[in-house]
Amino acid sequence: SIILTAHNKDWLINHVVNGILENTEGDYEVIFVIDGCSDRTEDVIFETIRSKDLKYKVAYAPDVFETKANNIGFKLAEGDKVIVVQDDMIIKEPGWNLRMQEPFNAFDDVFAVTSRTAHNWIFNPDTQHLNMEEDLDNCWCDICIHTDHATMKNTPRDVFAVRSSVNRGPLMIDHEDLKKMNYLDEEFAPLDM
């Protein structure tokens, strides 16, 4: 199941949708979550898929944070894997979804795979936020810092790096594991103070 949350991207969304349609292999569904759009994003999506043989669902959300919109899509998904594709991401690699599944096929303890970037977290001994009582909404929390970055720039094409955190889609997640967690936590944002 491919989850595409969209918020006011009428100028780009046709390229995003076509990238998925032209490069995804095997049986799949697309779940479009229209996230509080005030432009023509929804119309452009329907225009793009109108003549396509595509299994899809559409859900609507008020203008909510991306995590909540993703959860809406996850809960509608039928596949054993769910893939998050952001509304500004154009897929260009044929069979990209099968390639992302390779770590799941090779190991039985994989939770998620990203095609973009992953890293580990370590305690920041110079943190300014540890033991702060107030909730700061003007900066990222610095209690932990990311390290050991694995990106397209520093990781060979055929290497899958193991890290504690994956972010930025496309992001494939084991759907059963996600259900066991009761999906993504919509309130806890460890980096946002």
Residue ranges of predicted features:
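Glycine-rich, basic loop-to-helix element that forms the pyrophosphate-binding segment
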Residues: 61-77
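A recurrent flexible, glycine/aromatic-enriched loop bordering the glycosyltransferase active site
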Residues: 67-68, 141-142, 147-173
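Short, acidic, metal-binding catalytic loop of nucleotide-sugar glycosyltransferases
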Residues: 18-27
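Conserved donor NDP-sugar-binding/catalytic core segment of glycosyltransferases
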Residues: 94-141
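Donor nucleotide-sugar recognition loop
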Residues: 90, 164-168, 179-193
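Short aromatic/hydrophobic "clamp" motif used to bind/position activated sugar donors
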Residues: 82
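A conserved acidic beta->alpha catalytic loop
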Residues: 34-43, 90
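Short beta-strand/loop segment that forms part of the nucleotide-sugar
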Residues: 27-37, 59-62
